[in-house]
Amino acid sequence: MTLQYTALGDSLTVGVGAGLFEPGFVQRYKRKMEEDLNEEVSLIVFAKSGLETSEILAMLNEPFIMEQVKKADVITITGCGNDLLQSLEIYEKEKDEHVFLEASSHCQKNYSGMLEKIREIKGEKDTRYLVRLLNLYNPFPSIELADKWISGFNRHLKQLESAPQIKVIDTYAVFKGREKEYLSIDRVHPSSRGYEAMSEKLRAAGYGRLEG
């Protein structure tokens, strides 16, 4: 049996920062799944650098993407990093903390919308699939407010684990204290090592009912 893995998201799902011809976390996770489950995994990626959570949510209304979500055994989602970067730029100019709260609320609402849409596409009876939401790591550890905002957002994201098939992957913990090693030369996106660590964290979350 071939399993389908559908990956949705932003530049992290694209694999920006990994280096020329180096895989991001998506391809690495696919390989680990194949090893662990002893099954072939078919991968399809819907991702673009710069996407905000509202745009990722909007993708779930496109017929072809909906079809690939319906068929998916495993779905991963990355998002909110671009919302964060925009907030930081505004904060640098205006010094108003509310921009972070607004971005956090916006991201939470969109993530809830994504899960709701996936449930709608899948139908009530299908519960054998997995959804893995990757939370935010902090590429700016020296900016105290950014860390406070990201930690707060991650706490809220964790609350979306409302069903056994949904898990939030703690990317924040993976990168904490290892930014030099796990960030690429642009100091924002993961390096190859960072993506490998992300795929290991995904692997550690297990495969739920797919292991049955």
From Swiss-Prot:
Lipase involved in spore germination. SUPFAM superfamilies: SGNH hydrolase. It comes from the Bacteria. Its EC number is 3.-.-.-. The active site is at 11 (nucleophile), 186, 189. This is Spore germination lipase LipC. Substrate binds at residues 50, 82. Belongs to the 'GDSL' lipolytic enzyme family. It is an enzyme of class 3 (hydrolase). GO terms for molecular function: lysophospholipase activity. GO terms for biological process: sporulation resulting in formation of a cellular spore. The keyword NAD does not apply. Keywords: Hydrolase, Sporulation. Its main location: other. It is found in: Spore coat.
